[in-house]
A protein has these predicted regions:
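Short, Gly/Pro- and small/polar-rich lid/capping loops
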Residues: 4-26
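Non-cofactor substrate-recognition interfaces
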Residues: 1, 23-167
């Protein structure tokens, strides 16, 4: 499958040779503040009950709507947009986020969770939006710990104590 968005040849090569194609499903969350759909791509729909927040890329179209309601975060969003895409996606890079004050509703259980803008979410991968399950994903876990977000386990080991993130 072709990548959209004029990616540098280096990124295209990494996608083809290292990352490979991701298989998963699209889940549609509802944005509470403007009653619009926010599709997210996930490879682990089995963890949907552990979603404690959602994150969109700074280039995501919903960000324009958020900025109309909250112009105070515009400079922080612009700084994220101006970062190098390879740097943003780098393994081990600290993840940075902006709390939008908005929420999305989990379509499986109706729970409303905060919506963030994150520099590590890329618009040209999946839908540009992530359902965050910090108990079962290392990136989500690091982000949740940094910003003191809820961590909810939904998968447990057969024996012993759970060590987070349990992936």
């Amino acid at each position: 499958e072709e990548l959209r968005g004029g990616w540098p040849e280096k990124v295209l090569t990494m996608q083809k040779n290292w990352i490979g194609k991701s298989f998963g499903t699209e889940v549609v969350f509802q944005v509470v503040e403007n009653n619009t759909d926010l599709p997210v791509f996930t490879t682990r729909v089995d963890t949907i009950y552990g979603v404690t927040y959602a994150v969109v890329a700074p280039e995501h179209p919903i960000v324009d709507e958020i900025l109309k309601a909250n112009p105070a975060i515009k400079s922080a969003v612009m700084a994220m947009k101006n970062m190098d895409v390879i740097e943003r996606a780098a393994e081990g890079k600290e993840k940075n986020g902006i709390d939008t004050g908005w929420h999305v509703k989990n379509p499986y259980n109706g729970v409303e969770v905060p919506l963030w803008i994150g520099d590590y979410v890329l618009m040209n991968y999946g839908t540009g939006a992530v359902m965050a399950v910090p108990a079962h994903d290392e990136r989500d876990y690091a982000f949740a710990k940094k910003y003191n977000l809820e961590i909810k386990s939904v998968i447990f080991p057969k024996e012993g104590e759970i060590v987070l993130p349990f992936v």
